[in-house]
Design a protein with these regions (language model features):
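Membrane-interfacial amphipathic/re-entrant helices at transmembrane-helix boundaries
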Residues: 1-22, 35, 49, 56-62
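Hydrophobic alpha-helical transmembrane segments
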Residues: 9-12, 41, 61-69, 90-94, ...
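Helix-loop-helix "hairpin" substructures at the membrane interface of multi-pass membrane proteins
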Residues: 138-216
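Transmembrane helix-bundle core of multi-pass membrane transporters
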Residues: 100-162
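Short, non-helical or kinked segments that cap or interrupt transmembrane helices
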Residues: 28-46, 83-96, 168, 192, ...
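Alpha-helical transmembrane segments within multi-pass membrane transporters and channels
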Residues: 58-103
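Transmembrane alpha-helical segments in multi-pass inner-membrane proteins
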Residues: 201, 215-238
């Protein structure tokens, strides 16, 4: 029974890793007053771009950084449509999801062809912090990205709730008119929030391809983006 509980906790941390990244990204967006429904497509694009860059470069970290940049681009596109052009958030978000998904599928077929055998890479190795501890050893034998995701939770909380940037961000989300009257650039803050959020979402997607699976499949994200939106609501936007 003890081994089962230990293995369950360890597996929970691994499974939660992409959800943590993407949920933190969505938190930035929603605290700025933007419901980013492009999260599913951004995660999918992160999985594709991360796997492709890692496969072509031979470096898993290059894959993660490529996914980060690609996600930031997705966030910028979302800001262009929903913030600058005033397109309905739901329409622009779903449009981003469709666009990023289509680009990923098209790019994958162009680069890797349509072979029945999916290409694969050597994924991240698990890092054990307590290798000689029978309880903590299995729990803290995780991927580097898992440790980064866990560390980001208090960091993001501090940024959002304990800094001037976070105060302005929450003000933009709660009352953009009053924030604008106070001389704060609402467009700029929302754009920054969407870019940061998109980057985190894509890194969450890249975890699936460069750490968990070592491959890319068309159903790799499997609705995790929508789960993250639900987690934001259940967590009361904290």
């Amino acid at each position: 029974m003890g081994d089962f509980v230990i293995d369950l906790i360890a597996a929970t941390l691994r499974i939660a890793t992409p959800l943590i990244f993407a949920t933190l990204g969505e938190l930035f967006c929603e605290r700025a007053g933007i419901l980013n429904l492009g999260i599913e497509g951004t995660m999918f694009f992160g999985a594709f771009s991360g796997f492709t860059a890692a496969s072509l470069s031979g470096s898993l970290w290059v894959g993660v950084l490529t996914a980060l940049v690609g996600g930031m681009l997705s966030g910028w596109l979302m800001s262009l449509f929903s913030v600058r052009l005033g397109v309905n958030q739901h329409v622009s978000g779903l449009g981003i999801t469709l666009l990023m998904t289509a680009l990923s599928l098209f790019g994958f077929r162009v680069i890797f062809g349509e072979n029945r055998i999916l290409p694969s890479i050597e994924p991240f190795k698990q890092l054990s912090i307590f290798p000689n501890n029978p309880v903590l050893g299995p729990i803290f034998s995780q991927y580097a990205l898992t440790y980064i995701a866990i560390a980001l939770v208090p960091i993001v909380w501090w940024i959002v709730f304990r800094t001037n940037f976070g105060l302005n961000l929450r003000s933009v989300g709660d009352n953009p008119e009053a924030t604008d009257a106070a001389g704060i650039n609402v467009y700029r803050l929302r754009t920054i929030a969407l870019i940061i959020g998109g980057g985190l979402m894509a890194v969450g997607g890249s975890f699936l391809s460069v750490a968990q699976l070592g491959s890319f499949t068309f159903g790799i994200v499997a609705g995790r983006g929508w789960v993250c939106i639900a987690l934001i609501i259940f967590g009361n936007w904290h």
